From Swiss-Prot:
NAD(+) binds at residues 209-214. PROSITE patterns: ALDEHYDE_DEHYDR_CYS, ALDEHYDE_DEHYDR_GLU. This is N-succinylglutamate 5-semialdehyde dehydrogenase 1. CDD domains: ALDH_SGSD_AstD. Belongs to the aldehyde dehydrogenase family. AstD subfamily. Catalyzes the NAD-dependent reduction of succinylglutamate semialdehyde into succinylglutamate. It comes from Caulobacter vibrioides (strain ATCC 19089 / CIP 103742 / CB 15) (Caulobacter crescentus). It catalyses: N-succinyl-L-glutamate 5-semialdehyde + NAD(+) + H2O = N-succinyl-L-glutamate + NADH + 2 H(+). Pathway: Amino-acid degradation; L-arginine degradation via AST pathway; L-glutamate and succinate from L-arginine: step 4/5. Its EC number is 1.2.1.71. Keywords: Arginine metabolism, NAD, Oxidoreductase. It is an enzyme of class 1 (oxidoreductase). PANTHER family: ALDEHYDE DEHYDROGENASE-RELATED.
Amino acid sequence: MSASRLISRDPYTGEAIADFAVNDARSIDAACHSARAAFAEWAMTPLAERRAIALRFAETVRARREEIATLIARETGKPMWEALTEADSVAAKVAISIRAQDERAGERSEPMADATARLAHRPHGVLAVIGPFNFPMHLANGHIVPALLAGNAVVFKPSEKTPACGQLMGELWRAAGLPDHVLTIVIGGGEAGEALVRHEALDGVLFTGGVQAGRAIHRALADAPHKILALELGGNAPLVVWDVADIEAAAHLIVQSAYVTAGQRCTCARRLILPEGARGDALLEALTMLMDRLVIGGPFQSPAPFMGPVIDAHAAAQVLAAQDRMTADGGRPLRLAAVREARSALLSPGLIELTDAPLRDEEIFGPLLQVRRAADFDAALALANATRFGLAAGLISDDEALYRRFWTSVRAGIVNWNRPTTGASSAAPFGGVGGSGNHRPSAYYAADYSAYPVAGLESPSPVYRLPIGLNP
């Protein structure tokens, strides 16, 4: 990316997809002020009309499903089958968000003796949405849909890795009839993001992405408590496997947890916690055998791959550097992550045992899973909680009593039992605790931060009865 141009590249081939002009501070200023002007009319647009536009957006997405998925696959490198599921999720978000708005941010009234108590919700104003590259349309859309339904105007900056998906998002909303400047797309990297976050016309920032960027946004808004801030910052998810009879099924769940989307989901398992001894050894043997059979390749190849490349060569280098650090710490490589094809960000999955190595609490955003052993379940729980993050956690076990202990003890916002750690429902809260962020972004509870509650006492006419005395 130059100071004025941004080239989107295919992570698998390295080929250029599109070339974009980068928004500078002046154009971002214009976008924010245009959004502020558009907000006034959009907020007064009847809710039924705002919902009708959102429903047309969902219809447009369904009608252009293949086109959308193809662009997602090209720009992220994820397999076409997975890109299709993302396109479907973009459309499905509308109905979910409408229901969430009714249930969590609708209007309520309660009769009183001489008035009516009313609860309603108002939009904040102009919200910035800053999206990630791993689900460039689905996760950003999880902020955009509830924000627009609530009556906000939105300035959306997609990841600099996936600008074409961001531009397509704007095109789809325009095709649905969204008025001009209610949703504005700005393109750029860190400088554009900083100019957007610090803009005086904003009423809040909704961010999904890395920890460092999220903390920088938090600091930038530290003296602006009037601005809403929703952060989803990733995780270092533990997956505990304990007292399970079907080892092969457990291995499949581990692979789904750690390596889907080339390990580039914030809910991916980063730490596999196994029992010491023969049971743990058997699990690792089944896991490595399954890893050796995984199909890895380009997004459009046949047969379809399980996983494609990471987002770019820099991301691949970061994964390999983390693997080198783990090995230097005394880790025992069971399968080494390695670049599979020249000029590509395609990595094979890595697995490294670190039971006797120091704990490093970091999110490795790629297909690299570390293994640690525990003497008993209490020790496994302690290892699971040995992180400042708290997004997702999982237990694979036949013992429901162990799961109840896990559920009440593990510190995470998403806790799964005998399902991949990456499994989540858009109809349920999504988000974590600790270093994983605040609020519950991109899902059902996004309605909570898209509008603020307003309480009032209402009477159709003045009440003239005067008190005969005053309270002492």
